[in-house]
A protein has these predicted regions:
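Non-transmembrane, aqueous-exposed alpha-helical and coiled segments at domain scale
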Residues: 1-257
């Protein structure tokens, strides 16, 4: 409020962020998929290509914010065409891997962000722009679903007789039935219909006329995949690198604090 910020840019991580805000009026919200200034009227959020998006979490949190009086939360949110998507099956694999580790677990948030980063780094990411061609989307979702089922089946096989075998099977059953391709497709159609005309390219959107931009990360520096302490790290860069890369693309000569 004091800086008259008009744009908040998310530049790393995904919906595992948990940024608690309390307004002077007593409104409370824990932000995960939106910029933490959205309780301030007029402030915009930009989800850059450096952030990963869970359409489910985005839609759910948006409805919660609307119930708290932020009725235009979706209208004030803009998304990069090239944001990678965190699917429920990334979440399935992430949860099952952490269960398999048992006492050697890493402390994962188990939301699938790390698994989606792996796919993005390997050039296999499902991107926001891929959600708008429905026939192609069904094909891509089916490919991801089958690939993650194979990974999950391997975890189940390795874990037969283990203390977490029943939990692993229950996790697999839920994500392959309740979160099947048809259910996820319907949810993603709702997401794409809602945000379609507000999807943009990083450099075009960030080159706009803004007074003050805040770049909001998702984790602390000691979780950075290069500078943190393995294995207790996230899979993405948590320092200023992504923010600087975005600025270098679009706002040469900008004053940085």
């Amino acid at each position: 409020r004091k800086l008259n910020v008009d744009l908040i840019v998310r530049h790393n991580g995904g919906h595992q962020a948990a940024h608690n805000v309390v307004t002077p009026e007593g409104v409370r919200h824990c932000f995960s998929s939106f910029g933490s200034g959205m309780l301030i009227p007029g402030t915009k959020t930009f989800l850059s290509s450096k952030m990963l998006i869970s359409p489910d979490s985005f839609l759910n949190e948006g409805e919660i914010l609307k119930s708290k009086g932020v009725t235009d939360v979706f209208e004030r949110t803009f998304i990069s065409d090239n944001c990678p998507i965190v699917t429920p099956w990334h979440t399935m694999v992430g949860q099952m891997l952490e269960l398999e580790r048992d006492e050697a677990r890493h402390g994962s948030c188990r939301m699938g962000v790390g698994q989606a980063v792996y796919d993005s780094d390997a050039g296999r990411a499902l991107l926001v722009k891929d959600l708008f061609g429905y026939e192609k989307l069904v094909k891509r979702l089916t490919e991801i679903f089958e690939a993650k089922k194979r990974v999950a089946a391997g975890i189940l096989k390795r874990s037969l007789g283990s203390t977490n075998a029943a939990k692993l099977q229950a996790t697999f059953n839920y994500f392959t039935t309740e979160r099947n391709v048809s259910a996820v497709f319907d949810r993603y159609r709702k997401f794409s219909a809602l945000v379609g005309f507000r999807t943009v390219l990083d450099q075009q959107f960030l080159a706009g006329d803004y007074k003050t931009i805040i770049f909001e990360g998702a984790q602390g520096a000691l979780l950075d995949r290069e500078y943190g302490f393995a294995p207790y790290i996230t899979k993405s860069k948590t320092t200023y690198h992504n923010a600087k890369a975005l600025l270098d693309q679009s706002r040469a000569g900008v004053q940085i604090h």
